[in-house]
Every structure is written in structure tokens, then in C-alpha cells.
């Protein structure tokens, strides 16, 4: 277990573990307490549920302060809306700050990252934040929490954990389907008392239609331009579509370059009629 690993590291380095503390801010059924009891260490359990199995209830991760400090914080958040907790597992109505009731994945991720920042700052020097997350498939889209969440401190380890007895195990799907059968544990170490390195995933988009890159060849520019038109274009149409592209602007003989590229790749461009070509494969 992660608890054993962290304890072993401290003992190997000759550090005192008599006041070792495990904190679980979303403790659920209280599994963390059982682990702490097994290794005879102090445990602190919080949960939004007003009446949790163990520990302090009615604790709001988005609004309440972490009044304690810990050597290991085990954070197992909801997986967005896969399982609704308040108003379903406990309570009679959804709680507005329950991460399992976020209106969008973006809102969920913002709140998840807020929790990660808060919990990491509650670590003692040399402490670890263990974050257990999974993947989500929702409304035809795939979301990977471990890929999207922010990292703080030193990224010490990444563990893959198998999931068993999943709902998808017994379902039949009309479309090809890759089941989600794993969870991931990210172990983040607080190596310095004050300095906190971090990384946040950034996303963006660019259009090849008006962007030049060192890795973009004429062949792939022409091929993708033809894909965008359904797979067939005349040379005149290619000249028109690509004439304003940065590659063409930098090459006064771009029309000749387009013709030469098509000639150099007969396995990709098929002659249809005079001055007209189509891709050798069907465009999706």
C-alpha cells in the first residue's frame, strides 16, 4: 500500500514516524482508517457527508480550511457524475459543493484542481499527496482525469490499478467499445517546505490551413487540404486554396511545387482527369 511505502521511506531515511499522520479529506466508507489502524498511525478523516462512517462529517473541501497537517494525504475524489453521492448514496438532496454534481467536466476539473492545491499545502515537508482517479466516458467523449489534473511538487510515482466488477463488464454495446478497466494513483511529494513546483495541462488548437510548421511538408498540407474537400480537387482549386498559405507565400513557385509533390506521391494521389486528382483512400 501507499501508506506502507511512505512509512518505509521515512524509516529508511531515519526519520521519526511517531507522529505520522494520514489524512483522508473525502473518506467515504473509512477505508483509510482501517489502513492507518493496521500500521498503527494516526488518521484524520473528513467527509462532506454529515454522518460518515468515521471521522468528521459535514466538512466541505471547497469552503472549509484544512486545520490539520499530514505526512500522507489520500485523496479519492468522485469521478465527476459517474456516481452521484449527495442525494443518492447519502442525504436527501444534492449538495451544491459535491464534486459529483458538477454541471460540466470543466467545472469539475476546476474544483478538483482547487482541492489538489489546498491538500498539497496541508502536507508537512517530505509529505505525499496520493490522488486516486479514473477515466470517464460521457456523452460520447472520453475524459482522463489523470491526464487533465494539475501536478504539484515532485511527481514521485504513477501506479495503475485494475478495476473489477464494472458495469461495462456485463453490458453489450452496438458500437466498438474500449472498456475502462483501470484507475490511476498519482503520488506527489512535497520536498521543500516553501517552494512548490507545479504543472498544469494546457490545451489549444490551430488550423493547418493558415499555419506553417517545420514538420509540415507540402505532401501532408496538400493531402489534408484534399481531405477537407472530400478527397478530390483540381490543380486550380489547390492553387486557390493554398495560395495564401505561409508555405506558398514563401515560395514564388508554389504551383510547380504542388504539381511536383503530387507527381512524387503516386501512391497517395490518383489521376482522375486532366488537372484533377483524388486521394487513394476514402476520406472518413
Where is each model-derived feature located?
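Class I S-adenosyl-L-methionine-dependent methyltransferase catalytic core
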Residues: 1-264, 271-284
Amino acid at each position: 500500500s501507499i501508506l506502507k511505502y511512505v512509512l518505509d521511506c521515512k524509516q529508511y531515511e531515519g526519520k521519526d514516524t511517531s507522529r505520522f499522520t494520514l489524512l483522508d479529506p473525502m473518506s467515504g466508507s473509512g477505508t483509510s482508517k482501517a489502513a492507518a489502524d493496521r500500521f498503527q498511525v494516526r488518521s484524520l478523516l473528513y467527509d462532506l457527508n454529515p454522518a460518515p462512517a468515521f471521522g468528521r462529517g459535514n466538512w466541505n473541501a471547497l469552503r472549509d480550511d484544512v486545520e490539520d497537517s499530514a505526512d500522507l494525504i489520500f485523496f479519492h475524489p468522485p469521478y465527476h457524475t459517474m456516481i452521484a453521492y449527495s442525494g443518492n448514496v447519502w442525504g436527501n438532496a444534492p449538495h451544491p459543493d459535491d464534486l459529483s454534481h458538477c454541471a460540466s467536466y470543466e467545472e469539475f476539473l476546476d474544483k478538483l484542481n482547487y482541492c489538489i492545491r489546498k491538500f498539497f499545502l496541508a502536507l508537512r515537508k517530505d509529505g505525499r499527496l496520493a490522488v486516486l482517479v479514473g477515466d470517464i466516458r460521457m456523452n460520447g467523449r472520453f475524459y482522463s482525469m489523470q491526464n487533465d489534473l494539475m501536478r504539484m511538487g515532485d511527481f514521485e510515482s504513477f501506479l495503475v490499478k485494475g478495476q473489477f466488477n464494472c458495469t461495462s463488464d456485463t453490458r453489450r454495446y452496438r458500437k466498438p467499445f474500449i472498456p475502462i478497466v483501470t484507475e490511476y494513483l498519482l503520488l506527489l511529494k512535497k520536498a521543500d517546505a516553501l517552494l512548490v513546483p507545479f504543472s498544469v495541462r494546457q490545451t489549444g488548437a490551430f488550423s493547418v490551413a493558415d499555419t506553417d510548421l517545420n514538420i509540415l511538408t507540402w505532401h501532408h498540407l496538400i493531402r489534408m487540404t484534399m481531405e477537407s474537400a472530400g478527397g478530390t480537387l483540381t490543380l486550380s482549386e489547390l492553387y486557390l486554396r493554398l495560395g495564401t498559405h505561409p508555405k506558398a507565400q514563401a515560395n514564388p513557385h508554389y504551383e510547380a511545387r504542388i504539381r511536383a509533390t503530387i507527381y512524387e506521391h503516386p501512391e497517395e494521389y490518383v489521376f482522375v482527369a486532366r488537372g484533377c486528382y483524388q486521394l487513394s483512400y476514402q476520406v472518413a
